[in-house]
Amino acid sequence: PHKPLDDLTADEIIEIVKEAGIVGMGGAGFPTCVKLKPAKPVDTILLNGCECEPYLTADHKVLLAYADEIIFGLKAILKTTGAEKGIIVIEDNKPDAIELMKEKVADIGNMEVFVARTKYPQGAEKTLIKRVLGRIVPSGGLPADVGVIVDNISTVKAIADAIQTGMPLIERVATVTGEKIKNPGNFIIKIGTSVKDLIDYCGGFTDDDVLVKMGGPMMGFPLNTLDVPMMKGSNGIIAIDTDETKEQPCIKCGRCVDVCPMELSPLYFVKYAKEENWQGMKDMNVMDCVECRCCQYICSSKI
């Protein structure tokens, strides 16, 4: 364990986070020690507890099981960054977590709970900032450009562990679920545990016709082998039916444009990618894409 939080300087906290190997645990894996030293002043810390990806409930479980650690971790971030306020954002389909966290922050003047409407992809950084604070992160910009830092709930819990117990980031809570898993649930797993061992621990598959994804059904990616490790940003494994649907040519219906949370035009990304027109993709602001795959989900051509 390190010194009490009140006795630690901002630089000491950042060094603790760095030595503990803490990264963004919502999937991005960006080093948290870098995020705690923003190039521009920030006034607000958003704790992302939305977990809008279907099937996954790991962050929900962390909110319920480690509420005190989350509050401690948020205090550490506020002290380190000099931000004035911390907001814990939770979707309205988690009433038990909302009630618990509201109790925890009731007597803390610079913390509050924001209840967001359950909507995918609410948890995307830029979407979250716009929804909660009404601020728009510029194209190609970072949350710090509008005075905000966004951290995942599990990341903040890891910060608390590092300061309070000295434990580096060697384990995390992850969801193993899907209709093909015999005994689904949320588990504390060691970083580096193979997907195969994790699925075996859950009793294996219900049958052999299965598609395994690292992450959720929307933003997760299919695995060709189960001999891969769970990483710091691995929030879940799902096992679902295989999808044999074949891709058809784009009919330019525009449904992908309608559902894009970043107000982009995904149909042109497909066109330009096939043409290897990378400048065209850049001109269409492809770097603002948050890879939520709403366009893929809604696409009538199954692109």
Protein language model regions, located:
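Acidic low-complexity segments
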Residues: 1-25, 30, 39-40, 95
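Structural signature of FAD isoalloxazine-binding scaffolds in flavoprotein oxidoreductases
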Residues: 39-48, 234
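Gly-rich Lys/Arg/Thr-decorated short loops/hinges at beta-loop-alpha junctions or inter-strand turns
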Residues: 45-59, 180
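Short glycine/threonine-rich loop-to-helix capping motif typified by GTGT followed
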Residues: 94-102, 222-229, 300
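Ferredoxin-type iron-sulfur electron-transfer modules in oxidoreductases and energy-metabolism complexes
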Residues: 234-247, 255-257, 261-303
